[in-house]
Amino acid sequence: EVDRADLGLLTWPEQLDAVRYELEVLDGIPLNLDSAREAAGALYRNSRIYSAQALLPMEKLRKKQTTGVLYYRVRAFDLDGRPLGNYSQAVAVQSSLQKVERNAPVPRSRMQDTNGSLLLYPVYAYTGNPGATQYEVEVTDRRPENPDGTAPSRYRVFSRVTSLTDLYDENPRVGTYYWRVRGMDKEGKPVGQWSLPQKFTTRPSRKVKVGIYGDSISHGGGHLSFSPVDYAYSYSHYLDFPTVNLSESGDTSAMMVERFGRDVRPFHLKYLLIMGGTNSLRAGVSAEEVIRDLEEIGQKAEALGIHPIYLTLPPLNPANIQKAFDEPTADNWRQSFAQVNAYIRSRDHIDVAAPFETGEDLPTELSLDGIHGDWNMKQIMAQTINRSMAGRL
């Protein structure tokens, strides 16, 4: 019998412009509480929270508590560590708390219940449990036979240890799988047990006629702390028709050529939306080479009876890329983007770049990191795709 934990999952309204949050838990409401300053006597403070929820050690907090009611408040921060306004109003913890008796991270990836959630390359996201500084994620091809404890399942097909609260699977997953996660301390000793297994299925379906084939811009995520399972950051989430997302974060156009047969062939698609080359061009690969890759991807699609539709490449902001990722951008990027986009515009295409081509760098309010559109840019891209696809579907 596994010991029951006394934890609580606290959830607050998400701020789509936040890079991280700071959470304070207060013992009653102090008389001199200032919404612009940290509370001196806070029972709990965590300023490194990257999604709008936290798993709280309720038993410990109750032992320290002297008043009748615990309150919490949060404030959001930007990339430079500046608060995005003051703390929220202090609210009773109980009003936003879900009791958790399992000492395990809480899975956040909601696969399959929303548009844009069908990912060939899954992302496993979770809220960490108290005391854990790293996590092991396990993927199995059957429901794990050992739901409790910390031992690996005999059905394990993939596992990885990370200090982050999201993990990008580097393998395509076609079929039905389960994933779970457990916490560990910095020595690698278990903190609690496995989370309950989460089932997900990605398989060809006659209902899904459109595939999205690209890199991280299409895979989803942005604003540094949002991943492809934060669907507000995926343009596929705002489309008026179902899609399967065959994109892989980090891909160059050459990688997209290489994995085409393995990753696109199983899905019986009518249309393939192709957006690739951004990572190649910013690293200094020539426009000619990227155009050859895009041409080859189109030919491979046609050979499978799929109609290729190219998406133009929105501009970059090299200063923001440098700040967010510490990566340089090729000096001639504007010229090479213009060359590749001219090729794309000579083919069957959707001009998603046009609304952003002002001759300036991509504005920070549309893309904090200079390459991945934030939620607002993803919405504009989706509107352009919806208008173009309306007549075809």
Language model feature labels by segment:
Residues 6-17, 120-131:
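Conserved aromatic anchor
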Residues 317-393:
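Catalytic His-Asp segment of secreted/periplasmic serine-dependent ester chemistry enzymes
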Residues 275-279, 300-334:
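Active-site segments of SGNH/GDSL-like serine hydrolases
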Residues 188-249, 259-268:
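Serine-esterase "nucleophile elbow" of acetyl-processing enzymes
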Residues 22-67, 139-172:
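Recognizes extended acidic, P/S/T-rich segments that occur
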Residues 225-226, 254-293, 314-319:
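Oxyanion-hole/transition-state-stabilizing segment in secreted/luminal serine hydrolases
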